[in-house]
Each structure stands twice: as structure tokens, then as C-alpha cells.
Amino acid sequence: MHLEHLVTEQPNGQSANLDALGIPDALALMNREDAGIAARVAHALPAIASGVTVIADALRAGGRLIYIGAGNSGRIGYLDALECQPTFGTQPGEIIGIVAGGFAGITESVEDSDTLGRQDLDAAGLARGDVVVGLTASGRTPYVLGALRHARDTGCRTIAVACNVGSEAAALADVAIEVDCGPEVLTGSTRLKAGTAQKMICNMLSTISMVALGKTYGNLMVDVQVHNHKLRRRAIGIVSQAAGVPTDVAERALEQAGDRPRIAILMLCAGVDRAGAERLADAAGGSIRKALATLAPSTRA
């Protein structure tokens, strides 16, 4: 499909007089347009669920999650990948983001190269068993199309995230996540509604994949990495809430657990030492809920 025919490139009748509006009215217009994006993303939930399953299965088997895109789309994937290690304790390199031309994306022309998409995946050590998520608002960015083709040829599972329905990217993917965001307030500026939709989708793909892998207990980030005072206080609060103990008890357990909330919670809930908690976690694939379910009621603290 030619660029000028894409929904994301069409003029938005609601904002035809954008430059004549006062600041409050212009902001209200943008807010109204943005407000409908979550409902549009909701139509793609079945496809997003399929994507989560693919990602969780790959990570469980030792594969990686690789986001790849150009411009704003690529930066959204890069930022989502960047947050996974401190939030969920993923291993370095387990979830990565690749942006055409690097994060700064100074040379916009690189998105026109399908060869560069393949080369960047190879430079990242693409291997069978990885999952590649191609992010492209238009659904036709050559850099992303080349990356998806190469990933598919390598034997990787592929997911396309696009903001135009019936896209070329979708045809190259095992899972096609397409959201019709409608025309942008600023014609063709897909960093706006399309970017918001892509951010929502990436949030769901990574977060619910981590939930499926046992990286949470309830809605608590039990693998959060403790790198500063704020995160330490947060980790203490997580242990306190999960184990139902005062914060001073939670703090001592966290120290004994080597600053790992998951282990501290198991120590307190199962009444075991650090080594015992680590064994419980390993036997349950890291899931606190599954680990506690293996204990007799009388052994739970």
C-alpha cells in the first residue's frame, strides 16, 4: 500500500483548524483524540494474547525477545526492553531493543534499508529460538520488513505491531497486532496516537509475559533490582506486603536474601533460610505462588 493511502497519513477533519485554536482548545482536542486509543487497542487483545504466549514460551526455553523498529516506533521498543531488567530482573541481553541508526536515530534514511534490518539482527546475534517484534506504525517500513523476513528465515517466531490494518508487516509475522488509530491530530505524525498505541502494546507484551513466567507475586514486582534508596524502600515494601510482616522484619530478610525480594518472601513465608528459599524457587520455576503451594499448610509461616 502506498504511503499516501495509509490511514495514519490521512488528514484529521477534527484538527483541520488546529493552528487557529487557542491553547486550551487545542489541548482538549488532542486529549479527546488520545482518549479513544485504549478502546482501539482493546480490539487487538486476542492477537496481543497470542504474542504474549509466543514470547513467554521463547523466554522459558532460553530464547530472547528482540524489539526492532525505526524512528519513534523503534525507540518505544528500545525503552520497553530497557525497563525489563530493573523491573523484572531479566538477564542482560535477554530482552533487547534495536533502533535503525541507533537510539538517537539521527539518520532517518536508514529506515529505507531492508538490508540494514537484517544486518542489525545478525549483529545482535540472532538465533533460532528468539522472538522478533517488528514495530512499524505504517506497517511498511523497509528496515522492519527486512528484519521480519530475516527472522522468519532464521527460524525465529515473529510478531508485527502496526497501526494500519492489512499491512505488509502483518503478512510476514506469525502474530499480527494491528490497531487502526485513525488519522493523527498532526497529519502523518505517528509519534502521537500511533505511538501511544504501540507503547500500550509493548507494555502488555513485556509485562504479561513476565507475569506468565512467575516474575510477579500477585501484582508485586518480586524481582525488582535494588540499585538505589528508592528501589530499596520499594523492595522492602514488597516483601512486607507479600509476607505480611512489619517493614523492619522485611528489611532484615531482604538483606539476608542478598537484596532479592523473591527469596526474602519465600524465607519468611516458608520459614526457611536463604538456601532453602532458593531451592524452593528453583523447584517451582521461580514462581512464589507455585513454591508455596508445594508446602504443607503447617509449614507456612
Curated annotation (Swiss-Prot):
Pathway: Amino-sugar metabolism; 1,6-anhydro-N-acetylmuramate degradation; Amino-sugar metabolism; N-acetylmuramate degradation; Cell wall biogenesis; peptidoglycan recycling. One of its GO terms (molecular function) is carbohydrate derivative binding. One of its GO terms (biological process) is peptidoglycan turnover. It comes from Burkholderia lata (strain ATCC 17760 / DSM 23089 / LMG 22485 / NCIMB 9086 / R18194 / 383). It holds the Pfam family GKRP_SIS_N. The lineage of its organism: Bacteria, Pseudomonadati, Pseudomonadota, Betaproteobacteria, Burkholderiales. Specifically catalyzes the cleavage of the D-lactyl ether substituent of MurNAc 6-phosphate, producing GlcNAc 6-phosphate and D-lactate. Together with AnmK, is also required for the utilization of anhydro-N-acetylmuramic acid (anhMurNAc) either imported from the medium or derived from its own cell wall murein, and thus plays a role in cell wall recycling. It catalyses: N-acetyl-D-muramate 6-phosphate + H2O = N-acetyl-D-glucosamine 6-phosphate + (R)-lactate. Homodimer. Its EC number is 4.2.1.126. The keyword Lyase applies. This is N-acetylmuramic acid 6-phosphate etherase. Belongs to the GCKR-like family. MurNAc-6-P etherase subfamily. The active site is at 83 (proton donor), 111. A lyase-type mechanism (elimination/hydration) is suggested for the cleavage of the lactyl ether bond of MurNAc 6-phosphate, with the formation of an alpha,beta-unsaturated aldehyde intermediate with (E)-stereochemistry, followed by the syn addition of water to give product. Keywords: Carbohydrate metabolism, Lyase. Residues 55-215 form the SIS domain.
